[in-house]
Amino acid sequence: MKVLVVSDSHGNIQKLKNIIETEKSFDYIIHCGDGINDLIHIPIPRDAIVITVCGNIDRARGIAGKTWLVETICGYTFFITHGDEFGAHHDITGVWSEAKRLGCDIACFGHTHRAMNEKTSPYMFNPGAAQSGMYGVINISNNLMCELKRV
């Protein structure tokens, strides 16, 4: 199972398109906010499941949607958020604490524009800013294999 994780595309549709073209096929795409409508302009594999949460810029532009959610993918529980509502810009403790409280295996978040791949419990994964060509891939087989990438 392959999960593509992006965040903070901020209207840079070309970079987002490059990321999707580079990875070609994936089972899920998670957008952790701030540019979720950018996905509308990009061809996504037909069978891919799209999961999005609204970031602070999305909300400022009047886009309605959840700011965090919990999803189970291949038996792993994902806490997905932009992170601003949990204070991620200054400290990731709020994101970590909420993911832990909810019993999640991994927290996927954005907002900081800084990539993070920390094997804590729960796992903390921030793909960085897609507007700069940064993204992440999570491969799930017997365990989580998280990788940060750049186009």
What are these regions (language model features)?
Residues K2-V3, K17, T72-C74, S97-G103, ...:
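Binuclear metal-dependent phosphoesterase catalytic core
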Residues V5-S7, Y28-D34, I51-N56, F79-H82, ...:
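Active-site neighborhood of phospho(di)ester-bond hydrolases with catalytic His/Asp-centered motifs
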Residues D47-G87:
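Helix-adjacent hinge/juxtasegments
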Residues M1-D47, G62-K66, I140, E147-R150:
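N-terminal active-site segment of His-dependent metallophosphoesterases
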Residues H10-Q14, I36-I40, I57-G62, F86-D91, ...:
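Active-site environment of divalent metal-dependent phosphoester hydrolases
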Residues D38-D58, Y123, Q131-G133, C146-E147:
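Zn-dependent metallo-beta-lactamase
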Residues I73-A107:
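Mid-chain, well-packed structural core segment of small domains
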Residues I42, W68-V70, A99, A115-N117:
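Short secondary-structure boundary/capping segments
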